Amino acid sequence: MIEVRGLKKTFDGFAALDGADLSVPRGAVYGLVGPNGAGKTTLLRHLTGVYHQDSGSVTFDGQPVWENAGVKARIASIPDDWFYFMQAGLRDMMRFYRGLYPKFDQERFEKLREVFALDEKRPLRRMSKGQQKQAAFWLALCTMPDYLILDEPVDGLDPVMRRQVWSLILQDVAERGTTVLVSSHNLRELEDVCDHVGVMSRGKL
C-alpha cells in the first residue's frame, strides 16, 4: 500500500506540494490528473525517492522510500524524462537494470521482444521518443515490480502500442497484484484503465 500524509515541498518560496494526502491499496490502478503546475510530477518524484519532503511522510507498506534501497528495488518508474546512458543501447541498459533490480526477469525480457520490436544495439539517443518509451516499458516490466509509477507513460506511442502496453500492465495487476500510480493529462484514457482517479490542484489532492 502506498500512503502519503501531509506532504509538503517548497521550491524558492513556491509550495509545489501543500499538505498532499494519498492512499493507494495493493493491486489498484490509481490515476492522477490536474493542470500543469498542480504538483503531479513533484509528487511522483517523492514516491520514487528522488525528492525528500519538507514535512509529511511517504511510505510503501509502512516503510519510508527515502534512502531505502529495499523499497526502491520494488518500484519501477517511468518518468516523462526517462534516464539512459548517452552511449547505451537497449541491451546495455538491460544489463544495468539487471544489476539494480534483484528480481529482474531475463526470460521475460526475451519474451517481450515479440511485443517491442526494437534494435537492441542501436543507441537509445538515436531512437524516437516513442521508441525510447517502448524501451522504458520493456525494461520496467522485466524488473517484476510490486509498484509501477508512471508519468505521462504512453505519450508518444501509437494507438496499437498504447493498447499493448496497457494490456501488459493490467495483466501484471491481475496476476501479480502490481500497484500502479499513473499521471496523465488524458482523463479519458485513465477512466478506461484506473480503479480510482485523483485530481491535483495547487499541491493538494
Predicted regions and their residues:
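ABC transporter nucleotide-binding domains
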Residues: 2, 9-201, 205
